[in-house]
Amino acid sequence: ITIVDCSDYPKPVCSLEYMPLCGSDSKTYSNKCDFCNAVVDSNGTLNLSHFGKC
């Protein structure tokens, strides 16, 4: 299982850095910040499927 540490999130603003991650919802998130904010919003139900686009 691939783990991303989201303990520093949520953050109000994410950078425009593009390092895609694929969530367990089959959605591609543009970077760790976008992904971690979504994880927080999902109350922990969202996980990382893999690094890169879905």
Curated annotation (Swiss-Prot):
The lineage of its organism: Eukaryota, Metazoa, Chordata, Craniata, Vertebrata. Disulfide bonds join C6-C36, C14-C33, C22-C54. GO terms for cellular component: extracellular region. One of its GO terms (molecular function) is serine-type endopeptidase inhibitor activity. InterPro entries: Bifunctional_prot_inhibitor, Kazal_dom, Kazal_dom_sf, Prot_inh_Kazal-m. The record marks L16, E17 as: Reactive bond 3. Its main location: secreted. It is found in: Secreted. Keywords: Disulfide bond, Glycoprotein, Protease inhibitor, Repeat, Secreted, Serine protease inhibitor. SUPFAM superfamilies: Kazal-type serine protease inhibitors (SSF100895). Avian ovomucoid consists of three homologous, tandem Kazal family inhibitory domains. Glycans are attached at N43. Residues 4-54 form the Kazal-like domain. Pfam families: Kazal_1 (PF00050). This is Ovomucoid. The keyword Disulfide bond applies. Gene3D superfamilies: 3.30.60.30.
